[in-house]
Amino acid sequence: MTTEITTVKCPTCKQAVIWDAASIYRPFCSKRCQLIDLGEWADEEKCIPSDDMVSDSEDWSETR
């Protein structure tokens, strides 16, 4: 029985990453690339697109 090795590209540096339990930072190749990605989300360089327009006004509330 032959098992296929699945590889993905690291979202940060594009290096090939083997997708299995031994790759503890998957889909990233390393802790460094994982932290770079986290920093981009924290700095709002990355975001999930939305049709909702949220303003910073005083009327804004977390409940709808």
Swiss-Prot record:
What does the record give under GO molecular function?
Answer: DNA topoisomerase type II (double strand cut, ATP-hydrolyzing) inhibitor activity; zinc ion binding
Amino-acid positions noted as binding Zn(2+) in the UniProt annotation, renumbered to this chain: C10, C13, C29, C33
* Keyword Metal-binding (UniProt): yes
Which biological processes are named by the entry's GO terms?
Answer: regulation of DNA-templated transcription
**Annotated Pfam families:** YacG
Record key words, sorted: Metal-binding, Zinc
Query: Which PANTHER family does the record cross-reference, listed alphabetically?
Result: DNA GYRASE INHIBITOR YACG
Q: State the family named in the UniProt similarity comment for this chain.
A: Belongs to the DNA gyrase inhibitor YacG family.
Q: What is this protein called?
A: DNA gyrase inhibitor YacG
